[in-house]
Swiss-Prot record:
Annotated protein name in UniProt: Proteasome subunit beta 1
Propeptide section residues: 1-18
Organism: Staphylothermus marinus (strain ATCC 43588 / DSM 3639 / JCM 9404 / F1)
GO biological process, one term: proteasomal protein catabolic process
Enzyme class: hydrolase
Amino acid sequence: MVFIAVFNGVFAMSSLPGTVLGIKAVNGVVIAGEKRLTYDGYVLSKNTRKVHPITKHVGIGFAGLVGDAQFIIRALRMEAENYELQLGREIRVRGLAKILSLILYSYKLAPLMTEVVVGGFDEKGPQIYVLDPVGSLIEDKYVALGSGGPIALGIIEKEYREDIDVDEAEKLAVSAIREAIERDAVSGDGVDVLRITEEGYSLREYMFRRETS
C-alpha cells in the first residue's frame, strides 16, 4: 500500500517501512511481521515485534513508525477493556477495527504514520481488515503492507486457497515475509507470527538472517 499525505497543500507519497501481512484461513487468522527497525539508513533493532494481541481473539500488525503504532496499541487495549467492563463480553473484530478507523481519521491532518492489519475470530468467524493512516477500512481475505508488502503479496496471491487452514496460512506467511526480506532493505531478521483461532491466540517467532553471497 502507498501512503499519500497532504502537508501545507503539498502531496507526499511513500511506502511505510517494514513488512506485515494478514491471512484469513477457514479456522482462524494469521498476522505476521518481520522484526527489523530502521531509521535513516541505520538498523536500530533486529528484534522489534510488529504483531500484537489486543484481546484474546483480536490482534493487530503494523508497518510504519513504531511510536505511532505503540500509541495505537495502548488506545485499542484501553477501548477493548472498557467495552468488556461495560458490556460483559469481548469486543468483536469489526467493532475494534471501526474504533481504530475513527482514531486514525481523527488525526487525518497530522496522520499517524502506520498501516494496520486487524484480524481475529468471533461469532462471525475469522476476519481480516486493513486500515491506512487516515482510517480507510477494508475487509479482505489477505493483505500485505509496508515497503515489502508488494513482494509478500505476490507470494500470497500465488499460493492462497479458499480452504487454507491456519497451519498452512502460517507457513505461507513466513514464506512470503522471507521473500520480502530478500528484496527489501528495511525488512529483516526474522518473523513474528500471531495466530488467532476460536480457542484464542498464540505467538511464534522464526529467526533467520538475510543470505549473503
